Structures are given as C-alpha cells and as structure tokens.
Amino acid sequence: MMEPSFQVQGWCPGALRPMMSGDGLVVRVRPQAGRLTQTQAAGVAAAARTHGNGLIDLSARGNVQLRGVSTASHSALIADLRALGLIDAYATDEARRNVLVTPFADAATDALAARLGAALARMPQLPGKFGFVVDTGPAPVFAGIAGDIRFERAAGGGLLIRCEGATLAAPVAEDETSDAAVELAQWFVAAGGVTEGRGRMAALIGRGVAPEGRLAGSVAPASAAPAAVPGLVAEGALVGFAFGQMTADTMAALAALGPLRITPWRMVLIEGMRALPDLPGLILTADDPIRRVEACSGAPACLQALAPVRALTARLARDVPAGKLLHVSACAKGCAHPGPADLTLVATATGFDLIRGGSAQDTPDQRALSPETIDLKGLF
C-alpha cells in the first residue's frame, strides 16, 4: 500500500496550541457557543491586524482562525484574546472544547451549550478530533456535519442525545444533558472507541457496538431543515465568504452591525439584522457561483500544499453548473471537502489529477493536467 503524500495531524490547532503553516502560525479561536459579542468581534479584528497578516478564516467547526501570526507575537496575541474572554486557562481545556452549536440557537440551546461546556472537565481522555454537536434549534441544521455526540430534538420537540452513526437517539431531560454526555463519552472509551489516541463514534457504531440502558437509541430525530443559504432569516442576516476567508477590516465592519454567530458553512449570522449589509467581499445570494466550489488555502499558505489553488478555483467556478460541486485540493488530504464531489482536482508534483464523483484520495480518472489549460466544459 502506498504511503499518503500528506501528513495527518490527528489534532486541531487552537489558540494556545497553534499550528505552523506556510504563512506563519494558524491560531484558532473557539468562541463560546460559536458566538462573538460585538466587542469580541472587534477585538479579534484588531488582533488579526496587529499580530497576524490581517486574514481571518472561518473553520468547518464554526471557529475563527487568525493567519500569519509570528512566534514572536503569539504571546501578545494570547494576552489580547484572553482580555476578550476568548481563551481557556490551559491548552488541554481548549482542546476539549470541540463543541458546535447551531447558529439559530434559542435561550434553551444556549443554556444547554453552557452546561455542556462546564461538563467537559469531567470527560474522559478523548481523541483530539472528538466533537459534540448541539443542534437543538427550531429544526436540525447540522445533519451533514460530522460530530460524535449529538444533541437534537424529536419531531415533538423533546430533547435527544444521539451517537454519530446511529439512526435513533435517546430521550434526555434538560437537567440531565451534561451527565448524559459524560456518560456517553465514558461508554465510548470503555467500549473500545479509542485506538492509539484516535477514534470516532461513527466508526464504533459501524462495528455494531451500541450503548444500552438509558442511552440506547429509541426515538428518531426531527427531519432536517433545508440547507442554509445566504440571505435574511428570522434570526438576522446570513452572509458568506469566498473560501471562508475575510479580512480584518471586514470583521470589524461586521462587528459594528451586531453580535456574530460563526457557522460551519463559511457563513456568519449577524444577529438581529433586518437588511443585508452593503460590504465588499460578501456572498449575499444562494446562486453565487463561488458557492459551487471548495478549495483549501493552498500554496504558499499551507506547508503540505503542492500548488496554489484559490485563483484557479475562482476562475473555474463560473463553469460549475448550479447544483454541482467542484473541489480543488492542494494535496491528497482534501481538507476543504473530505467527502466526494462531482469533480475533484488534486494537485500533484506533475500537475492536477481529476476525479469524478469521488474524494481527493480516490483513484484519478485523468492525471497531470496543467492548471493553465484545465477546462471543465463537458465534464459535469
């Protein structure tokens, strides 16, 4: 079996444990419940200008990442973020706080997320990418986003806890959510879900192992809501960003409009907005062609990248039909879109490989394509 041409880290960067990339340190800030107050958002923008290169990424886990931070400025950045209430006491605490919360949260959802956050210290030692999903808004919106332990609602509104990969969930009372999450995490470890520090709930469930007793699944979650798109919603204005990246100036402008809910869809919800903001660089409509493509940072921003990809992806976006997806990856790791796409282009040492209906790690249909001459016409 061939060795992969990329390195799998097995952990996610944080603020206290940043990751070195091609443009400096990547410092990931994990807002509580995915929400930034206006003061916090303005502070993050200022910190990105002062300590980084002024670019801010939205991660697939609803976090914000400051790019281009130097090792010399990291300590000062942490001090600024700590003053904003965005930093945990220790890196181990930060690593545990892998909690994705629906941006359409009500008071009950925010309270559940707070209880879960307080319970993380009672969790067993879990793999670095083990995550919790709080999807208890008016309707589930994270059906296509992986987690490990999920809080959802039944069709009648009752609260549920579900293992990723399981069809049915267990009913749980509001005041028992944190205890149930701890118990389910303990069961995951005891049932053999962790091997050499790694493991995911879906893999364990896929082996036919399932919890028993009060955590046994017996109720189906409510049907998922339609996919979120840019535009006005009941809670405010959803705005998107090409490749999930904005400038510090854009973040500062958004902060002036209202509190921000960071989503895993490369979008931000501006709470309470009743009109779409008139700011440069925002995606405001569902039919924008840039929403039909996914691309990672590419070279030179990523150390593992074999080529620049974003300019190429932006050029090709106009040729992607509505309802189709093009994924352009700078290596076979496929960070921007781990799953299959209608077309995937993967950078190699000799050009780009093309994969139809697969992921970046699948066998190519065409190899060594020149980025200057790639033409998507007739391929979809």
Model-derived features: positions:
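Small-residue-enriched alpha-helical segments and adjacent helix-cap loops
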Residues: 2-5, 21-162, 167, 171-175, ...
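Intrinsic-disorder/low-complexity linker and hinge segments
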Residues: 89-90, 217-224, 272, 372-373
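Short flexible/disordered coil segments
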Residues: 119-126, 190-201, 320-322, 353-365
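An acidic, glycine-/histidine-flanked metal-binding catalytic module
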Residues: 152-226, 261, 362-366, 380
